[in-house]
C-alpha cells in the first residue's frame, strides 16, 4: 500500500509507555486471511539505520486494530520478502 502522507500510529510497549511509529506498508495474505503491518519509529533520524517492526493485525469495527506479534518462521519469511520487494522498488 503506497501512502501519500505517512500514516502514524501509537504503540504501547511492555511497560505501557507509548511510542509513535510511521507505517511503512500493510499487506494481506489471501491464503491465510491474515493482515500484516510494518512500522518504523517516527523519531528516528533519516541517516540512522532503520529498525523495522512488523506485526500481524486485525481490524476492529470502530476503525481500531489489534496488533499481534509474529511468531512463526513462515510469517517472518513473508514479511521479509515484502520488505525486500519494497526496498528494491524504492531503489529502482
Curated annotation (Swiss-Prot):
InterPro entries: UPF0473. Transmembrane segments: none annotated. Disulfide bonds: none annotated. Pfam families: DUF1292. It comes from the Bacteria. Belongs to the UPF0473 family. NCBIfam families: PRK13678.1-4 (NF010217), PRK13678.2-5 (NF010222). This is UPF0473 protein OB2006.
Amino acid at each position: 500500500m503506497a501512502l501519500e502522507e505517512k500514516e502514524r500510529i501509537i504503540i504501547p510497549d511492555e511497560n505501557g509507555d507509548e511510542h509513535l511509529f510511521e507505517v511503512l506498508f500493510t499487506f494481506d495474505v489471501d491464503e491465510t486471511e491474515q493482515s500484516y503491518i510494518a512500522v518504523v519509529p517516527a523519531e528516528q533520524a533519516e541517516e540512522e539505520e532503520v529498525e523495522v517492526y512488523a506485526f500481524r493485525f486485525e481490524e476492529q469495527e470502530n476503525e481500531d486494530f489489534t496488533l499481534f506479534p509474529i511468531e512463526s518462521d513462515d510469517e517472518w519469511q513473508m514479511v521479509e520478502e515484502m520488505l525486500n520487494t519494497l526496498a528494491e522498488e524504492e531503489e529502482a
